[in-house]
């Protein structure tokens, strides 16, 4: 396990900015899951910083939507979606049918954990006015945003 945590960052960009300012950091031990953080890939290329990545959990995507979720989607009963991960959002959209994709891009309010997730959803066609971004990339901030939307 981890015995001594020196710094905690709210997002990858905050970590990268810190590394630019503080040249004393020589070693980073990154605990992660199956999905690779694209932003942190750049740390591997920085000279003088030893970067260890350890997978501590695995994400397995379902091949199909559950029958209950499929029914909600088909009946257009979904009003709000919460996105904690861009990869998971992409995987979800890939499992939708054409008409369902159109509905989700224009009629659903999407709550995004970060600006990066919001930009990714814009790229796949989600209408900008339907995107809401959490002030901070954490669960508490997401729940405050959800409470404000309702």
Label every PLM stretch briefly:
Residues 1-150:
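Conserved beta-alpha
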């Amino acid at each position: 396990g981890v015995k001594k945590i020196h710094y905690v960052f709210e997002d990858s960009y905050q970590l990268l900015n810190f590394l630019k300012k503080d040249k004393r950091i020589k070693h980073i031990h990154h605990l992660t899951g199956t999905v690779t953080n694209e932003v942190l890939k750049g740390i591997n290329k920085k000279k003088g910083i030893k970067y260890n990545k350890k997978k501590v959990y695995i994400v397995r995507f379902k091949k199909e939507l559950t029958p209950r979720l499929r029914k909600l989607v088909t009946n257009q009963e979904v009003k709000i979606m919460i996105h904690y991960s861009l990869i998971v959002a992409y995987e979800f959209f890939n499992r939708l049918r054409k008409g369902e994709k159109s509905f989700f891009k224009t009629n659903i309010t999407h709550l995004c954990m970060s600006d990066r997730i919001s930009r990714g959803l814009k790229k796949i066609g989600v209408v900008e006015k339907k995107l809401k971004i959490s002030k901070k990339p954490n669960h508490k901030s997401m729940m405050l945003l959800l409470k404000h939307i309702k």
